[in-house]
Swiss-Prot record:
Name of this chain's protein: tRNA-cytidine(32) 2-sulfurtransferase
Main subcellular location of this protein, as a coarse class: cytoplasm
Example GO molecular function: ATP binding
InterPro entries, alphabetized: Rossmann-like_a/b/a_fold, TilS/TtcA_N, tRNA_Cyd_32_2_STrfase, tRNA_thiolation_TtcA_Ctu1
Pathway: tRNA modification
Enzyme class: transferase
SUPFAM superfamilies: Adenine nucleotide alpha hydrolases-like
Binding-site list for [4Fe-4S] cluster: C112, C115, C202
């Protein structure tokens, strides 16, 4: 694919390249399943990883994977057609998640948490089925810092996301190469390159995850005083000083008498 905004493309690609190097996300011989939901983030991730692959000093393979959870109106055919036109290997997995969620969901709860857990399980299984040792997800910098704030404000933990971690199945390594890329860089990139964005078609999409939207709003307000606040929060995740925290295990590790 020939990108409209070459400068923006290079900026995002360089940021992903730094993340790959900093966190050891990709190694020679990797076969990577890239989760493509039909959103701007996953399309961007797939194209950037392909751009890096063509010039990388190591050899790796990409396989795009999409899960159709059975939500009425979800246009998985649009995703499949686009990826086929772009020359990507693509696997579409159809599930009955929508029916399961409607049956199991507690009254008043959102679809999001159940849906996410079900999708994760399928993605891990798919990665193994397709011979992939890694699964790439499209979480960007904003997702990392919003998750950090959500866990601090509502859960009481110092926890965000990891750019590289072993999945629950103990077999697949999950990577998040967009960790250094802000959402505001992805939005115009996706728009200018006319990615065929497909909404998830969830019946409560847009009303769920209100707490995350509150974090987005808070960060937007903070940026008015400190434009670098999101990157500062991200740096904090890699600049931990255990002796100044309250975790008792960390205190023992620091040999505090």
């Amino acid at each position: 694919m020939e990108f409209i905004d070459n400068i923006r493309y290079k900026k995002i690609k360089n940021a992903v390249g730094r993340a790959v190097a900093d966190f050891g996300l990709i190694r020679d011989g990797d076969r990577i399943a890239v989760a493509v939901s039909g959103g701007k983030d996953s399309y961007t991730l797939l194209h950037i990883l392909e751009g890096l692959r063509r010039r990388a000093p190591v050899k790796y393979e990409l396989v795009a994977v999409t899960i159709d959870s059975g939500y009425p109106g979800f246009r998985s055919d649009v995703i499949a057609s686009y990826l086929r036109e772009q020359g990507f290997a693509h696997h579409l997995e159809t599930t009955d998640h929508y029916d399961i969620i409607r049956e199991k969901r507690r009254p008043g709860s959102s679809y999001c948490s159940i849906c996410a857990r079900l999708k994760r399980g399928v993605l891990y299984t798919l990665a193994q089925k397709l011979g992939c040792n890694k699964l790439a997800l499209g979480h960007h910098l904003d997702d990392f810092v919003e998750t950090l704030l959500l866990n601090q404000f509502f859960v009481g933990t110092l926890k965000a996301m990891a750019p590289r971690m072993l999945a629950d199945n103990g077999e697949t390594t999950v990577i998040r190469p967009l960790v250094y890329v802000e959402e505001r860089e992805i939005i115009p990139f996706a728009r200018e390159n006319r990615f065929p964005v497909v909404c998830c078609s969830c019946p409560v999409c847009g009303t769920a995850d209100l707490q995350r939207r509150r974090m987005k709003k808070l960060l937007t307000e903070l940026e008015k005083e400190n434009p670098a606040v999101k990157r500062s929060l991200l740096r904090a995740l890699g600049n931990v000083q255990p002796r100044y925290l309250l975790d008792l295990e960390l205190q023992r590790l620091c040999d505090v008498p």
